Curated annotation (Swiss-Prot):
One of its GO terms (cellular component) is heterochromatin. Changing residue 126 to M: In ASGD3 and RIEG3; with glaucoma; decreased location at the nucleus; decreased transcription regulatory region DNA binding; decreased sequence-specific DNA binding transcription factor activity. It comes from the Eukaryota. Phosphorylated. Phosphorylated on Ser-272 in response to epidermal growth factor (EGF) in a ERK1/2 MAPK-dependent signaling pathway; phosphorylation contributes to its protein stability and transcriptional activity. This is Forkhead box protein C1. Residues 373-387, 446-458 have a biased composition (Gly residues). It comes from Homo sapiens (Human). Residues 1-51, 466-553 are annotated as: Required for transcriptional activation. It is found in: Nucleus. Residues 356-368 have a biased composition (Polar residues). One of its GO terms (molecular function) is DNA binding, bending. Changing residue 79 to E: Decreased nuclear localization. No effect on DNA-binding activity. Decreased transcriptional activity.
Length: 553
């Protein structure tokens, strides 16, 4: 195959290696055509023509030809070394580790062709670096050797100027003062190293610290001991006055925030420290899928005056984590009812029970949430917080929840004042976990508790009046298209103020058909929230949505 090419001129020789891939290509094509080498297409004759090779630039042909290659353009690129590195190279390559200025110039030009041009510029920089850097020491010339100019050498302390001998990385600018200080420090270290007892005292302070540590360390241990005592010896909840109930709720918030176990400020005061709360969260979320809803804790009629205490929550969390959610909501409902009956301002009640909750509201929805909190009880803020707590609900959903609250307000005129006050939303920050689990339950014990009758308080008065409506609403929306309105339905029962109704006429028309379907639903008389949804069905498609938990109330 090679014999077919004419090798008369060296230029054509330079082109032949360039065709290495195309030779095999054309050879395979000719063999496939069945014509053998005689059927070579025209391009081969073009490439083998010596006159055609002359069209290539001379430099390219010479690069492949037998001539000695000229300096490549890459040789004209400036080397990545600083002038200090270049001078150091020249000095270290000298036989006596000292070299004259002209010797430095010659070494640089021999090693790097880039510096063969523009000598005046870079040689001036070399002189500046020699005189300005303390690492280069000028040695006077002795008279024995002919020539002129002093020698330049490196300071003995500057040999470690470059990291690992690489001239590309210099540690820092060498200074004589720093070198002297380093020497002194090394001498001190050498003096301190021989006596080993000198190193023993440092371990002593940790022992002393351990001796003193029982002061700061016991509080977590004592707190846990108290929890276990409360868990093993549950004390009955003591009825308190409304003001005392609110005081205990707010007082319980302070040690939790200060306790070392509490690391998140977004937990409401009703939440236990994270040390024991995670044991309740996954159990109540995952257990709600497979296990039937647990029976509700008994809610006696004097539950309205019952105070919310840490003992209550700790015993419930220790006893049965699944029923802890319902008892948590009932305890919060009691304290919320107490605060609303005591006539305390709703923002105060909301702030006392959810200290870090205001930071969860998105800025566009702040007006709606503030209006709801000042509207009546904590219900408005509860509805707004339920919509905006996770940061994924928009203002229109808050409007829907407030509309639903205003629409449902008429059914609750006989209910105790603001029984479902801010309790609908208070447990929600504890359970509004960012990942969407497959359970279609988890917050229905709270939303449904407040919606279906204030978590046991209203259930005593209207066991089936509103509960069935909530259940039918929730079941009608099980298709998933309007599943995001479950929070609105949960907040619907909690508000006792129809004043918000006038602001949402357009939204009301949207839900008119749904409202008519609710009253005629066969599930109306059902007083429980037993819903069996498939575990794979997810109510929410957003990332930080609420998940709903079913439990009896």
């Amino acid at each position: 195959m090679q014999a077919r090419y004419s090798v008369s001129s060296p230029n054509s020789l330079g082109v032949v290696p360039y065709l290495g891939g195309e030779q095999s290509y054309y050879r395979a094509a000719a063999a496939a055509a069945g014509g053998g080498y005689t059927a070579m297409p025209a391009p081969m004759s073009v490439y083998s023509h010596p006159a055609h090779a002359e069209q290539y630039p001379g430099g390219m042909a010479r690069a492949y030809g037998p001539y000695t290659p000229q300096p490549q353009p890459k040789d004209m690129v400036k080397p990545p070394y600083s002038y200090i590195a270049l001078i150091t190279m020249a000095i270290q390559n000298a036989p006596d580790k000292k070299i004259t200025l002209n010797g430095i110039y010659q070494f640089i030009m021999d090693r790097f062709p880039f510096y063969r041009d523009n000598k005046q510029g870079w040689q001036n920089s070399i002189r500046h670096n020699l005189s300005l850097n303390e690492c280069f020491v000028k040695v006077p010339r002795d008279d024995k050797k002919p020539g002129k100019g002093s020698y330049w050498t490196l300071d003995p302390d500057s040999y470690n100027m470059f990291e690992n001998g690489s001239f590309l990385r210099r540690r820092r600018r060498f200074k004589k003062k720093d070198a002297v200080k380093d020497k002194e420090e090394k001498d001190r270290l050498h003096l301190k190293e021989p006596p080993p007892p000198g190193r023993q005292p440092p371990p002593a302070p940790p022992e002393q610290a351990d001796g003193n540590a029982p002061g700061p360390q016991p509080p977590p241990v004592r707190i846990q001991d108290i929890k276990t005592e409360n868990g093993t010896c549950p004390s009955p909840p003591q009825p308190l006055s409304p003001a005392a109930a609110l005081g205990s709720g707010s007082a319980a918030a302070v040690p939790k925030i200060e306790s070392p176990d509490s690391s998140s400020s977004s937990l409401s005061s009703g939440s236990s420290p994270p040390g024991s709360l995670p044991s309740a969260r996954p159990l109540s979320l995952d257990g709600a899928d497979s296990a039937p809803p647990p029976p509700a804790p008994s809610a006696p009629p004097p539950h309205h005056s019952q105070g919310f205490s840490v003992d209550n929550i700790m015993t419930s969390l220790r006893g049965s984590p699944q029923s802890a959610a319902a008892e948590l909501s009932s305890g919060l409902l009691a304290s919320a009812a107490a605060s609303s009956r005591a006539g305390i301002a709703p923002p105060l009640a909301l702030g006392a029970y959810s200290p870090g909750q205001s930071s969860l509201y998105s800025s566009p929805c702040s007006q709606t949430s503030s209006a709801g909190s000042s509207g009546g009880g904590g219900g408005g803020a509860g509805a707004a917080g339920g919509a905006g707590g996770a940061g994924t609900y928009h203002c229109n959903l808050q409007a829907m929840s407030l509309y639903a609250a205003g629409e449902r307000g008429g059914h609750l005129q006989g209910a105790p004042g603001g029984a479902g006050g801010s309790a609908v939303d208070d447990p929600l920050p504890d359970y509004s976990l960012p990942p969407v689990t497959s359970s279609s339950s988890s917050s229905l014990s709270h939303g449904g508790g407040g919606g279906g009758g204030g978590g046991g308080q209203e259930a005593g008065h209207h066991p089936a009046a509103h509960q069935g409506r909530l259940t039918s609403w929730y079941l009608n929306q099980a298709g998933g298209d309007l599943g995001h309105l479950a929070s609105a339905a949960a907040a619907a029962a909690a508000a006792g103020y129809p004043g918000q109704q006038q602001n949402f006429h357009s939204v009301r028309e949207m839900f008119e058909s749904q409202r008519i379907g609710l009253n005629n639903s066969p599930v109306n008389g059902n007083s429980s929230c037993q819903m069996a949804f498939p575990s794979s069905q997810s109510l929410y498609r957003t990332s930080g949505a609420f998940v709903y938990d079913c439990s009896k109330f």
